[in-house]
């Protein structure tokens, strides 16, 4: 029998939480109810999901998907997020790929750590996933006198209408995932 449990695959020995079951059920309902998304959602599943509070009494749903299915999720990202936001009654939905950080190899060992498993690469990848469908067109790091730093991310102004209302959500989700403070802006186009 095909059930919503097929839509979530956790690591061995872990049981999905109640909220993760709710998200898996939403995916299952999309596959069975929505004709335009049916064929695209059929082979997709999630790894984990959690809900978090964002400033201003809003909530965000963060869904972790397998890294190798990232491309397939990106093809239908806009439609999928719109449908999921309807199902979760106005909560912002953010889809990120599950990535792993591997510790640096010990001195003298012959093991080479892939670039994609470094902390920097994982945090940059998560940042790209969080702001998708907008593209990052620039990045500035500002160091304050007290030693703290603020990362300014410039997003593609073409996607301003689709993403501007979610900037608080993007900031809160990235802070929760990586522990870094980020400020999002849209660069002003210079007229010559």
Curated annotation (Swiss-Prot):
GO biological process: ribosomal small subunit biogenesis; rRNA processing; translation
InterPro entries, per the entry: Ribosomal_eS7, Ribosomal_eS7_CS
Entry GO MF terms: structural constituent of ribosome
Record GO cellular component, one term: small-subunit processome
Keywords: Ribonucleoprotein, Ribosomal protein
Family stated for the protein in its record: Belongs to the eukaryotic ribosomal protein eS7 family.
Protein name: Small ribosomal subunit protein eS7
Organism taxonomic ancestry: Eukaryota, Viridiplantae, Streptophyta, Embryophyta, Tracheophyta
């Amino acid at each position: 029998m095909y059930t919503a449990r097929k839509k979530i695959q956790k690591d061995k020995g872990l049981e999905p939480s109640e909220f993760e079951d709710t998200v898996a059920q939403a995916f299952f309902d999309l596959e069975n109810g929505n004709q335009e998304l049916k064929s695209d959602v059929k082979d997709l599943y999630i790894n984990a999901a959690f809900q978090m509070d964002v400033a201003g009494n809003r909530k965000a749903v963060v869904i972790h998907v397998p890294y190798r299915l990232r491309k397939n999720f990106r093809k239908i990202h806009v439609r999928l997020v719109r449908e999921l936001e309807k199902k979760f009654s106005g909560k912002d939905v953010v889809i990120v790929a599950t990535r792993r950080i591997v510790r640096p190899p010990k001195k003298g060992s012959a093991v080479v750590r892939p670039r994609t498993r470094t902390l920097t690469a994982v945090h940059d990848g998560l940042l790209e996933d969080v702001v998708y469908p907008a593209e990052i067109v620039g990045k500035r790091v500002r160091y304050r006198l007290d030693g703290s730093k603020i990362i300014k991310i410039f997003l593609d102004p073409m996607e301003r209408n689709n993403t501007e209302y979610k900037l608080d959500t993007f900031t809160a989700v990235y802070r929760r995932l990586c522990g870094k403070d980020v400020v999002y802006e849209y660069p002003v186009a210079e007229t010559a």
